[in-house]
Every structure is written in C-alpha cells, then in structure tokens.
C-alpha cells in the first residue's frame, strides 16, 4: 500500500490506525495514516 501523495488519483482522507500494545500494560499505538488510492474512474 502506498500513501496518497499523487495528484489526479481518487484518494481518501487520513484514517486513524490503532495497533494493540505488545505488552499487557501498554497503551494503544494510534497513528494517522493515509488510506489507499483507488484506481479507475469514480
């Protein structure tokens, strides 16, 4: 998956992706990332 930095593509806004902590006492690792671009017309 590539980040949406290309012009002319149909891209979605950023979404928050949360990754469970490796330890039981850790916090959720949440980061904002770009959704993937869809190919084709729409």
From Swiss-Prot:
Residue ranges that the Swiss-Prot or TrEMBL entry lists as coiled coil: none
Keywords of this entry: Antimicrobial, Disulfide bond, Ion channel impairing toxin, Myotoxin, Neurotoxin, Potassium channel impairing toxin, Secreted, Toxin, Voltage-gated potassium channel impairing toxin
Major place of residence: secreted
Tissue and organ distribution: Expressed by the venom gland.
UniProt cross-references to Pfam families, sorted A to Z: Myotoxins
GO molecular function: potassium channel regulator activity; toxin activity
Family, as annotated: Belongs to the crotamine-myotoxin family.
Protein name as catalogued: Crotamine Ile-19
